[in-house]
């Protein structure tokens, strides 16, 4: 049995299902490139038949990624498999991942078929997918609640049909480690052709057991783990990639297994996914949480000073989180900032040093010392602005009357090269700023959620504002970042306005395509 575990990342497919708003193609490509640097073996990047947008993003990523195998999901239906194959055809190497439900409750209540019918559909789907590639993966959806006799039959039939990877999902996170590992062990004992396929597991975290179940399965012979960065995913999330990777690295003495993960890329990738997906990592999250390497107990601190391994089973540096003893202030030169970005794992083509240094100096003048998370926040926001350039917030000033709770805001916004200035009165500074921006843009939106979080520590920390807004029946998510809360709030709304503008352009293009189709040959 091989001593290497294949890491199958599904951040861009299963992970994206947890997001309030879908990622853009550019954002998905950023994450895909980060996953490639991280060293994932396979990345599942979408469900092409689900929408033209998903098809386009899968195709774009498939064209770009060279060192990881790109995979797309398809139900056990010819149309789904056709869409996946067409989107992936541009890739140097690709996998089609097809699936069907196998548990009694799914077969009877959702599919309304007999198990034998479902078995035949699975076999036909695998055979059909093999027309396009030798790398076909088959998943038994809700395997954790599937009668073991049926599961053994399904796995044997799928392997015979040509599946080279068989995935056993705990779709609803129901099993406990002893149960799940027994399922894997039983498959190895009872399926006669099991040696002709890699056994994979895909565990959800509804009971907080996804990582434990995956490790239990590995101990019984599974050699692929499906996971996501930061454990994001539907409901309570998926098995966490960084936890699986570091368990296997840290406990190689016990498990004797390895992966192809470049551990020093973990922190950087986690931060990128958190920022782009607007899903903050909880402070006590294993491996990548802000407290993961913090020691506040006096006894622990004393031990750490004497020998770090008294209370650290891995180092921050091992995941790319460097302890920085260099203070970055307005007196720091451009080369210092460039060097620090490279120390944090960024490549020179990930950021524009001139733009970064300009924003760094502005921030340093405001808050004195600038920290790593400040630099990363500036880089992240630069990607947002670069993508959404229809509206630009040029100036914002606010005056508040604390006695009456009334505020006046004046904004200057650049709209496709033209400066527009508007003022408004509101119930507080944020409300006033929003009304002024609405006037300048000519769009009235409904704010359905508003969230403020600190990016750093202390009173001079950067503030991130995340809003969800509704406009003409559609939902948009915006983010803004600044040392001033009102400015961050204004930037978040401008971000929403740009997303609306982009959506309108896409709708116009779709309408034109539809018109051309309807009038072709007329």
From Swiss-Prot:
Superkingdom: Bacteria
Catalytic reaction list: 3-methyl-2-oxobutanoate + acetyl-CoA + H2O = (2S)-2-isopropylmalate + CoA + H(+)
Keywords: Amino-acid biosynthesis, Branched-chain amino acid biosynthesis, Cytoplasm, Leucine biosynthesis, Manganese, Metal-binding, Transferase
Enzyme kind, highest EC tier: transferase
Binding, Mn(2+): 14, 202, 204, 238
EC number: 2.3.3.13
Protein name per the record: 2-isopropylmalate synthase
Native species: Shewanella denitrificans (strain OS217 / ATCC BAA-1090 / DSM 15013)
């Amino acid at each position: 049995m091989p001593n290497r575990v294949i890491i199958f990342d599904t951040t861009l497919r299963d992970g994206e299902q947890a997001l309030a708003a879908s990622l853009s193609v550019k954002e998905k490509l950023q994450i895909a490139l980060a996953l490639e640097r991280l060293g994932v073996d396979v990345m599942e990047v979408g469900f092409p038949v689900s929408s033209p947008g998903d098809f386009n993003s899968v195709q774009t990523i498939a064209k770009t990624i060279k060192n990881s195998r790109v995979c797309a999901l398809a139900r056990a239906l010819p149309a789904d498999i056709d869409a996946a194959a067409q989107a992936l055809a541009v890739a140097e190497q690709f996998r089609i991942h097809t699936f069907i439900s196998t548990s009694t409750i799914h077969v009877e209540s959702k599919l309304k078929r007999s198990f034998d019918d479902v078995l035949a559909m699975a076999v036909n789907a695998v055979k059909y997918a093999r027309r396009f590639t030798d790398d076909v993966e088959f998943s038994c959806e809700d395997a954790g609640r599937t009668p073991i006799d049926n599961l053994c039959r399904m796995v044997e039939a799928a392997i015979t049909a040509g599946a080279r990877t068989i995935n056993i999902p705990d779709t609803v996170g129901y099993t406990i480690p002893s149960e799940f590992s027994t399922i894997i062990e039983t498959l190895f004992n009872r399926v006669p052709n099991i040696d002709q396929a890699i056994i994979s597991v895909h565990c959800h975290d509804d009971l907080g057991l996804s990582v434990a179940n995956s490790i239990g399965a590995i101990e019984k012979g599974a050699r692929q783990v499906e996971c996501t960065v930061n454990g994001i995913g539907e409901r309570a999330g998926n098995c966490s990639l960084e936890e699986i990777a570091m368990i296997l690295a840290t406990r190689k003495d016990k498990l004797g297994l390895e992966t192809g993960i470049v551990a020093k890329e973990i922190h950087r990738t986690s931060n990128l996914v958190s920022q782009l997906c607007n899903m903050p990592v909880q402070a006590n999250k294993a491996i990548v949480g802000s407290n993961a390497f913090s020691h506040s107990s006096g006894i622990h601190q004393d031990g750490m000073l004497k020998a770090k391994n008294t209370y650290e089973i891995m180092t921050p540096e091992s995941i790319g989180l460097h302890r920085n003893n260099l203070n970055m202030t307005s007196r720091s030169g451009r080369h210092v900032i460039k060097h620090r970005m490279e120390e944090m794992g960024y490549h020179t083509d990930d950021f524009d040093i001139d733009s970064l240094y300009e924003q760094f100096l502005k921030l340093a003048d405001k808050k004195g010392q600038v920290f790593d998370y400040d630099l990363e926040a500036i880089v992240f926001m630069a990607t947002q602005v670069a993508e959404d350039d229809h509206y630009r917030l040029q100036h914002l000033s606010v005056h508040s009357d604390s006695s009456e709770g009334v505020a006046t805001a004046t904004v200057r916004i650049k709209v496709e090269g033209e400066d527009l200035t508007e003022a408004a009165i509101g119930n507080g500074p944020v409300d006033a700023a929003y009304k002024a921006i609405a006037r300048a843009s000519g769009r009235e939106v409904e704010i359905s959620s508003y969230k403020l979080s600190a990016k750093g520590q202390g009173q001079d920390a950067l503030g991130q504002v995340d809003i969800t807004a509704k406009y003409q029946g559609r939902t948009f998510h915006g983010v803004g970042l600044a040392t001033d809360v009102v400015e961050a709030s204004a930037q978040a709304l401008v971000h929403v306005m740009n997303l609306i503008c982009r959506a309108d352009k896409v709708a116009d293009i779709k309408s034109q395509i539809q018109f051309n189709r309807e009038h072709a040959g007329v």
